[in-house]
Curated annotation (Swiss-Prot):
EC number: 1.13.11.2
EC class: oxidoreductase
Protein's UniProt name: Metapyrocatechase
Species of the source: Geobacillus stearothermophilus
Family per record: Belongs to the extradiol ring-cleavage dioxygenase family.
Length: 327
């Protein structure tokens, strides 16, 4: 074993919330509540806050009305107040820090920053925990609220995937400043086309994919977790019957090995649903899995199931108006 082993950084604990932008706010709310079983926990101005029934925090999703679909921001929780201060120092050194805000519904003061590609992010420690109403309390004491009796309810927030003009640069930024660890990666003759990184034993809390037009700051998808593959078939049946577009029906990824499906919410954002956890990483000396792009189609993207459409590789939000070329 090398004596130069780099001590891991455990200052970021988890993906805590994501803000989506939607030009059809109320229709987006219907999708997430009526069909995915999420609960509205607050409204403020032109924003609505939601959570899944096994999310312990006040909210994990904020949807804000906007002219275009896309990403508002990504929120990370630090592992301690001291960890927050350490990460802020590194973010300030990077030149991409934007400064402190007092907080938002569901969390305390936060330090805002951007990725090199311009995705808005923030990191904080103080959070508000969800407090169920009496009728929502469950006898299952390790669950924060009852399983909803509507739709096919998702259980918790899982991960975010962002499109970027330079996946390699954004990946290294997250590794260097926040302590993320590289789990899997797609390369094409040395060029990085996609990275899956995490701060926990999950395969990823965030991924970066190549934006084919070199456009910056795009969202590829937001993912919520079921943990049971059959739930994906139940949801697909429900959504098709109610005329929601399913881009990729229930399927198994090669990269991450997760059972998945992709749909579009009414505002235009791609939403992924996970039917299981894929695989977990507990090895402290994990070597990243490197895929060559030529080996990805039919193996890395889909291991079991239908071939992924070109739109999965090309389309992010906001939607580009340029002609796109598959990476």
């Amino acid at each position: 074993m090398s004596k130069n082993f780099q001590e891991p950084i455990f200052d970021v604990a988890q993906l805590a919330h994501v803000e989506l932008l939607s030009p059809k706010l109320e229709e987006s709310i219907v999708f997430f509540t009526k069909y995915l079983g999420m609960e509205v926990t607050a409204r403020a101005g032109n924003s609505v806050y939601l959570r899944a029934y096994e999310d312990f925090y006040h909210n994990t999703l904020k949807i804000t009305e906007s002219a275009e679909a896309g990403l508002g921001h990504v929120g990370w929780r630090a592992s301690s107040p001291q960890a927050l201060e350490r990460r802020v120092l590194e973010l300030e050194k990077s030149g991409l820090g934007r400064g402190w805000i007092d907080g938002d519904i569901g969390h305390g003061k936060a330090y805002q920053f951007t990725t090199p590609d311009g995705h808005q992010m923030e990191i904080f420690f103080e959070v508000e925990y969800y407090k169920p109403q009496p009728e929502q309390k469950t006898k299952l004491l390790n669950r924060p609220s009852k399983r909803p009796a509507q739709g096919v309810p998702v259980r918790r927030l899982d991960h975010i995937n962002l499109m970027t003009s330079n996946p390699g640069v954004d990946t290294q930024f997250m590794i260097d400043t926040l302590g993320f660890r590289l789990r899997e990666q797609i390369r094409d003759k040395g060029k990085i086309l996609g990275s899956w990184i995490s701060v926990s034993n999950l395969v990823h809390e965030i991924a970066f994919m190549q934006e084919p037009n070199q456009e910056k700051g795009k969202l590829h998808h937001l993912c919520y977790w079921y943990g049971i593959p059959q739930n994906l078939y139940d949801l697909a049946d429900l959504l098709k019957d109610h005329e929601y577009f399913i881009e990729v029906p229930p399927n198994k990824h090669g990269i991450s090995q997760a059972f998945c499906m992709y749909v579009y919410e009414p505002g235009g954002n791609r939403i992924e649903l996970f039917g299981d956890a894929g695989y977990l990483i507990t090895d402290p000396t994990w070597e990243p899995v490197i895929w060559e792009m030529e080996d990805v189609p039919g193996n890395g993207d889909t291991w079991i199931g239908t071939a992924f459409p070109d739109s999965w590789w090309l389309r992010g939000t906001p939607v580009t108006t340029k002609e796109v070329v598959k990476p």
